[in-house]
């Protein structure tokens, strides 16, 4: 796969960034780890048990809510008035042993100047577990999780605006790394640089459309299928 589909600014166009915001799942680790497949399965199991419906219908609801509301949890909260905590605890009770330590990625993230944040639609507990297993947790100033966002998920604009306000971020100095292209639209509108980290996990219709792209959408400034290589190519001010 090529590094980019279109003529875009060189990676060193990010050299002045001082806030580095990373999505978690399928961004900081490769989708081939199949970690999110565990979460995906447990979502269906939880819905089937809590709503008392057959598993195939539970899976249908899971995917339908994901597409309609941004996350399955948002749909369960809005349609079924379900409390979020039991869902988050259950779906994130997974085996992290499949995750490798990533010393090369650690090296590249560690050299990024300024602040580093994780911004996830998952729980803080999940993010801490994953980043810890990867050997990256101590590199990040904070984790902005779904609870911190008032259970408003990406790509909702309110989630991004809340994160920016909470952490005092100047959007013009920030860059967002994401595997979901729709989650980069608002960062672009807010004035952030955006990087699509391409994933082999394509569970959303918008991701499926990526297969037919002949050029990158305007809201995606850079794309890569190798985060270590991309970060390693940055010419960083003060480094």
Set out the residue ranges of the language-model regions.
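Hydrophobic residues in well-ordered beta-strands that form the structural core
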Residues: 30, 118-120, 196
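A generic structural signal for short
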Residues: 32, 61-62, 115-116, 148, ...
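Conserved aromatic
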Residues: 52, 81, 121, 221-224
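Short glycine/proline-enriched coil/turn segments at helix->beta-strand junctions
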Residues: 78-81, 112-116, 190-193
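N-terminal helical cap/lid subdomain that shapes the substrate entry/recognition surface
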Residues: 8-22, 27-106, 125
């Amino acid at each position: 796969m090529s590094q980019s589909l279109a003529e875009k600014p060189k990676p060193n166009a990010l050299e002045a960034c001082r806030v580095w915001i990373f999505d978690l799942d399928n961004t900081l680790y490769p989708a081939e780890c199949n970690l999110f497949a565990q979460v995906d399965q447990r979502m269906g199991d939880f819905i089937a048990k809590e709503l008392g419906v057959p598993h195939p219908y539970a899976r249908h609801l899971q995917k339908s809510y994901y597409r309609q509301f941004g996350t399955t949890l948002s749909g369960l909260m809005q349609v079924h008035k379900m409390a979020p905590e039991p869902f988050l605890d259950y779906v994130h009770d997974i085996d992290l042993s499949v995750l490798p330590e990533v010393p090369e990625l650690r090296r590249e993230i560690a050299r990024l100047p300024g602040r580093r944040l994780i911004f996830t639609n998952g729980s803080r507990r999940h993010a801490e577990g994953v980043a810890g297993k990867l050997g990256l947790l101590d590199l990040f100033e904070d984790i902005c999780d779904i609870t911190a966002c008032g259970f408003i998920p990406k790509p909702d604009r309110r989630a991004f605006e809340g994160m920016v306000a909470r952490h005092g971020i100047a959007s013009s100095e920030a860059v967002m790394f994401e595997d979901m292209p729709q989650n980069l639209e608002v960062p672009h509108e807010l004035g952030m640089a955006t990087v699509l980290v391409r994933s082999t996990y394509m569970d959303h219709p918008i991701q499926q459309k990526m297969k037919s792209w002949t050029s990158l959408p305007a809201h995606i400034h850079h794309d890569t299928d190798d985060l270590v290589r991309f970060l390693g190519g940055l010419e960083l001010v003060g480094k």
